[in-house]
């Protein structure tokens, strides 16, 4: 009797082939022309903890928030190289080629002295010292307000990354409950990891995690005051490294350090998640402390030996497929540096002059300010892209806006006969089609960046700029000439005549 049995082995079907992403080196050719661009001295002044409004409920900001724990995202605007007038007509053919910029060097200058940044909260939730406890405090769920005024130094962070698109950040935030899932009021809500664009002014992780504190901490006492209404973002290095085109991060440099300064516990009940009874032996008074532990960070020593800024960086190979090509004639530089975070204390007398007599604290008004100083210098290389059908197809798949900026049309004209009215806006004809004219829309118009216009800052004389001279020495283009030492004193030496022997 013949019996059919299913096959016991499992067949592996390979995934569908995807479009191969080519490196920019395969369709972008580089020239031997380099340019230097440098910004002016970039300064910003503000309050280190919060914004100051003109009135209590007004939206007019009179003093901005300038914290050393914020991201600085510079949008470097470069000129269009296709509009340059080159003396060498054989450099490129505008009918067959287009010019783009390639990043080769970068230096981020930082002014101001090194200093420890200080943060804190006047009503910080510090219930008990659980690192060195001297007594058992189990009244964390009582009605007594145990919050204190506490300051600390945050995690020390130095980081910068550059690309032709803004960097991505990640943080944990509140999410919705699943449909049909039963939950009660006061239950711990579900959270999810979100990816957002890092904008200028976003807060950095200072040692309390990358999360949305405004949505996940309702009592506004668990973290320092500068992040209590913000979301601390951490750069999503994993996602940017796996990006197909590699436009968001050509390369990055980072240095982070911290240690646990104090270990404490939080006040408040533990909600619907108490400590399991099988994890401890019961006490006679049934007073069990809370397990909501946390540590206060400390960035420790700040020294000039560990500085990442005020030094040049050269790009030979990017981490992604984009090897430093600035599509759209722009670059996005994301910077974090809280090693120069000294808060400036300003004291002013009530009559705008020092008070006479004995010191009275109420006679003076105290203010806080924080200042930052930057300078950005870059070396860019002139590159060419041939307008071949293959190259245009690659670039159009990557970003169609690049083709539009080059004033090219990849779609053929329509073969149908359309109607065109001469007096379309008159009362004698039909109503015009309500289609707004198509304009170039900035894809990053809704984001906040520090725009730095470098269109009038380009120079080809690299030996006249500090970064340009470093680049020339690095590439063996310029070497110091050998100095000939000439003797200024002449000493006459008398030689004795050599007597010849007579034969």
Curated annotation (Swiss-Prot):
Keyword Kinase part of the UniProt annotation: no
Pfam families in the cross-refs: Late_protein_L1
Spans annotated as Disordered: 270-289
Molecular function in Gene Ontology: structural molecule activity
InterPro entries per UniProt: Capsid_L1_Papillomavir, Capsid_L1_sf_Papillomavir, dsDNA_vir_gr_I_capsid
Cellular location(s): Virion; Host nucleus
Record-linked SUPFAM superfamilies: Group I dsDNA viruses
Keywords: Capsid protein, Disulfide bond, Host nucleus, Host-virus interaction, Late protein, T=7 icosahedral capsid protein, Viral attachment to host cell, Viral penetration into host cytoplasm, Virion, Virus endocytosis by host, Virus entry into host cell
An example Gene Ontology biological process: endocytosis involved in viral entry into host cell
CC terms in the record's Gene Ontology section: host cell nucleus; T=7 icosahedral viral capsid
Domain of life: Viruses
Primary role: Forms an icosahedral capsid with a T=7 symmetry and a 50 nm diameter. The capsid is composed of 72 pentamers linked to each other by disulfide bonds and associated with L2 proteins. Binds to heparan sulfate proteoglycans on cell surface of basal layer keratinocytes to provide initial virion attachment. This binding mediates a conformational change in the virus capsid that facilitates efficient infection. The virion enters the host cell via endocytosis. During virus trafficking, L1 protein dissociates from the viral DNA and the genomic DNA is released to the host nucleus.
Family (UniProt): Belongs to the papillomaviridae L1 protein family.
Subunit structure: Self-assembles into homopentamers. The capsid has an icosahedral symmetry and consists of 72 capsomers, with each capsomer being a pentamer of L1. Interacts with the minor capsid protein L2; this interaction is necessary for viral genome encapsidation. Interacts with protein E2; this interaction enhances E2-dependent replication and transcription activation.
Protein name from the UniProt record: Major capsid protein L1
Source organism: Canine oral papillomavirus (strain Y62) (COPV)
